[in-house]
């Protein structure tokens, strides 16, 4: 009990300590945290029997959030693989207006579709990924096809070479984010996935944004040793629309800070199926992911991923069947990984991109700009996945 109290106390001290390094101190603390110890006692767990359990100073900030139940029909929710909005739980945080956290609202089995899409479909060309800078378009044309047999029969050993899917760190869809100029442009665009657009628009409508348009997405692929650096998503031209985040696979610690980095962040878990919305005041807050955590239920996948996707789906469903062969590949991947989809609207209604040419800027190769810290066996040592660090 003494060690636990001391650990919680140290987190509380860091969380309330102002100063230039307030965010970074907590980032380092949680990056080095040990699962199953008192290190994580101060992390808010919104999914803990829907009780928003936590013992740190952040737990006192948790409040219930109201959703717009009538804005999404049960039929449309079902088409996206979601429970009726009336059955969702939603939380906010005092001091963070516009922040909404929805613990796993997906129907049993329906997460399978979104995981498969991230690994099998969205990773294909013409979408853009981090491997494009190191390989030809032909080599990255179909990462799934090149990796599926390897993942299906892979052996758990640190010395084996990784498949291309395991080297994947980010994919962009819709308006493709330019990591060098930190801008979007009209001429760097491919059609946004219709199923992901539909899912995003239902969630946005339930949160009060019925006119939200899904125009750009950044998919992040985390290994257990990956991190996402402190940053703000500010490159979109319309900040009045929310940023949506969908998590699948292993859990992660998410840090939500303030407008400046000298404000200490609030720590929370993001589990498989959880959805997070940053809007209004919270749309431009600093945030980061310092730690991906192995499944606390033991080796393998979270329980919410055990139920299979129904073999027969409604004719108008945006969700497609997932074969057991495909899921075997997905499950093998997720045992040591997390996938996150972030969706945003880039332009306001009737808004166009600026006419001035977008100049390419030299890439900043400092550690600050790189977010994923991979292990020593990776051929792609570090991959930048956050827009505005």
UniProtKB/Swiss-Prot annotation:
**Cofactor(s) listed:** Fe(2+)
Effect seen on changing residue 64 to A? Does not affect DNA lyase activity
Q: Which domain of life is it from?
A: Eukaryota
* Impact when changing residue 158 to A: Does not affect DNA lyase activity
> Site annotation (Primary catalytic residue forming the imine linkage with DNA): which residues?
133
Picking any one GO biological process from the record gives: RNA repair
Record EC number: 1.14.11.-, 1.14.11.51, 4.2.99.18, 1.14.11.33
The site feature described as Secondary catalytic residue forming the imine linkage with DNA is recorded at 133
List the Pfam families hit by this protein, alphabetically.
Answer: 2OG-FeII_Oxy_2 (PF13532)
Q: What subcellular compartments does it reside in? A: Nucleus; Mitochondrion
Effect on the protein of changing residue 55 to A: Does not affect DNA lyase activity
Where is the major localization of this protein?
Answer: nucleus
Q: What is the effect of changing residue 371 to A?
A: Does not affect DNA lyase activity
Expression sites (tissue/organ): Ubiquitous.
Designated name of the protein: Nucleic acid dioxygenase ALKBH1
> Gene name on record?
ALKBH1
């Amino acid at each position: 009990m003494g060690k636990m109290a001391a650990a919680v106390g140290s987190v509380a001290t860091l969380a309330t300590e102002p100063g230039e390094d307030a965010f970074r101190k907590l980032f380092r603390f949680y990056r080095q945290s040990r699962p199953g110890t008192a290190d994580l006692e101060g992390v808010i767990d919104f999914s803990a029997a829907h009780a928003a359990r936590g013992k740190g100073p952040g737990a006192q900030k948790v409040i219930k959030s109201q959703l717009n139940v009538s804005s999404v029909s049960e039929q449309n929710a079902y088409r996206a693989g979601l429970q009726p909005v009336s059955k969702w739980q939603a939380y906010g945080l005092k001091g963070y207006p516009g922040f909404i956290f929805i613990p796993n609202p997906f129907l049993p089995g329906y997460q399978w579709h979104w995981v498969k899409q991230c690994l099998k479909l969205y990773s294909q060309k013409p979408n853009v990924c981090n491997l494009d800078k190191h390989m030809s378009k032909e080599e990255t044309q179909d990462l799934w096809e090149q990796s599926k047999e390897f993942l299906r029969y892979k052996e758990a050993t640190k010395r084996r070479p990784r498949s291309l899917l395991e080297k994947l760190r980010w994919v962009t869809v819709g308006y493709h984010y330019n990591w060098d100029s930190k801008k979007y442009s009209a001429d760097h665009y491919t059609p946004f996935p219709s199923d992901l657009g539909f899912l995003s628009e239902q969630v946005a409508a339930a949160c009060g944004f019925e006119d939200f348009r899904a125009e750009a997405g950044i998919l992040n692929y985390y290994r257990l040793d990956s991190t996402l650096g402190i940053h703000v998503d500010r490159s979109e031209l319309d900040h009045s629309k929310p940023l949506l985040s969908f998590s699948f696979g292993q859990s992660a610690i998410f840090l939500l800070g303030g407008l400046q980095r000298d404000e200490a962040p609030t720590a929370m878990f993001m589990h498989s199926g959880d959805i997070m919305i940053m809007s209004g005041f919270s749309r431009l807050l600093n945030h980061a992911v310092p730690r991906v955590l192995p499944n606390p239920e033991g080796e393998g996948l979270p329980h919410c991923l055990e139920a299979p996707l129904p073999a027969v789906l409604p004719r108008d469903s945006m969700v497609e069947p997932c074969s057991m062969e495909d899921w075997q590949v997905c499950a093998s991947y997720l045992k040591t990984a997390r996938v996150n989809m972030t969706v945003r609207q880039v332009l306001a209604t009737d808004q166009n991109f600026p006419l001035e040419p977008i100049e390419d800027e030299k890439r900043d190769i400092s550690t600050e700009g790189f977010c994923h810290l991979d292990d020593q066996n990776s051929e792609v040592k570090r991959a930048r996945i956050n827009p505005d660090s």
